[in-house]
Curated annotation (Swiss-Prot):
Belongs to the natriuretic peptide family. This is Natriuretic peptides B. The precursor molecule is proteolytically cleaved, possibly by FURIN or CORIN, to produce the active peptide. May undergo further proteolytic cleavage by various proteases such as DPP4, MME and possibly FAP, to give rise to a variety of shorter peptides. May be cleaved at Pro-99 by the prolyl endopeptidase FAP (seprase) activity (in vitro). May be degraded by IDE. During IDE degradation, the resulting products initially increase the activation of NPR1 and can also stimulate NPR2 to produce cGMP before the fragments are completely degraded and inactivated by IDE (in vitro). Pfam families: ANP. Keywords: Disulfide bond, Hormone, Secreted, Signal, Vasoactive. The keyword Cytoplasm does not apply. PANTHER family: ATRIAL NATRIURETIC FACTOR PRECURSOR, NATRIURETIC PEPTIDES B. GO terms for biological process: blood vessel diameter maintenance; cGMP biosynthetic process; cGMP-mediated signaling; negative regulation of systemic arterial blood pressure; neuropeptide signaling pathway; protein folding; receptor guanylyl cyclase signaling pathway.
Length: 129
């Protein structure tokens, strides 16, 4: 056996023995771990649940107030004006605010079924990563 090969194997053996004596063991996440962490995690989970319930209760309190203010603002807004007041621009604005599904469905308004839906090479293709 070559002296360099023997030396490298001996060093690897010594490294392996050293690591095995140190207690290099894996600690799986789902396996039995330190029990001292469990109460801390349980307390953190309880605090998170309390905070979520507080936020939900606050949202329920604020929601009716916002709806009431929305009614008052509707009377003062220009959207409450008659349709003739805004003229032809109103229909254009409504179309722009409408769903974008038809507008962004393909490349320059045409749907590229073969390229766009199968390979992801067409225009405006949503990636599913």
């Amino acid at each position: 056996m070559d002296p360099q090969t023997a030396l490298s194997r001996a060093l690897l053996l010594l490294l392996f023995l050293h690591l095995s004596l140190l207690g290099c063991r894996s600690h799986p996440v789902g396996g039995p771990g330190p029990v001292s962490e469990l109460p801390g995690l349980q307390e953190l989970l309880d605090r998170l649940r309390d905070r979520v319930s507080e936020l939900q209760a606050e949202q329920l309190r604020v929601e009716p107030l916002q709806q009431g203010q929305g009614l008052e603002e509707t009377w003062d807004s220009p959207a409450a004006a008659p349709a003739g007041f805004l003229g032809p621009h109103h229909s254009i604005l409504r179309a722009l605010r409408g769903p974008k599904m038809m507008r962004d469905s393909g490349c320059f308004g045409r749907r590229l079924d073969r390229i766009g839906s199968l390979s992801g090479l067409g225009c405006n293709v949503l990636r599913r990563y």
